[in-house]
């Protein structure tokens, strides 16, 4: 199992409805979103496409993507950091089983602009796999030198 990230475009009204749900209903609604086969998957060649797409699935690379974008772990990131919000959201709906984060529509343009200004390839190239390991970035795959090229390629696709 493990932790993974999926991204869905919903309206502010839908985000507010999610905020109002009890834990069991919230889990059910999120499950419905993840099983919606009519939603389009995003083009992962450019991260800012996440903000325009219906669905984006980063699987288990969300924490590594956050680290490349911000240089910090999620717990160390400053409030209102648009690059952090792009990965984790800003309005948090927590349950015992999952973290659900939302981004209000008013923040999307600023976050998209911040993503557009990032030289992701340069940031990724500046990091060593040992940097991810030292920061305890999930998933724990950073001690596999034979997979480094594949890991970097997967992160670049994010």
Question: What do these predicted ranges mean?
Answer:
Residues 1-157:
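Acidic (Asp/Glu-rich) sequence patches and key acidic residues
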């Amino acid at each position: 199992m493990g932790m993974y990230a999926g991204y869905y475009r919903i309206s502010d009204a839908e985000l507010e409805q999610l905020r109002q749900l009890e834990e069991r209903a919230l889990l059910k609604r999120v499950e419905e979103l993840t099983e919606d086969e009519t939603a389009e998957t995003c083009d992962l060649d450019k991260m800012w496409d996440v903000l325009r797409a219906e669905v984006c699935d980063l699987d288990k690379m969300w924490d590594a993507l956050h680290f490349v974008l911000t240089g910090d772990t999620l717990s160390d990131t400053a409030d209102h950091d648009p690059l952090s919000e792009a990965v984790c959201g800003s309005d948090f709906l927590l349950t015992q089983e999952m973290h659900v984060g939302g981004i209000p529509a008013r923040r999307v343009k600023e976050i998209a602009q911040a993503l557009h200004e990032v030289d992701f390839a340069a940031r990724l190239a500046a990091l060593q796999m040992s940097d991810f390991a030292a920061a305890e970035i999930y998933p724990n795959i950073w001690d596999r030198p034979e997979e480094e090229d594949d890991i970097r390629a997967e992160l670049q696709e994010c």
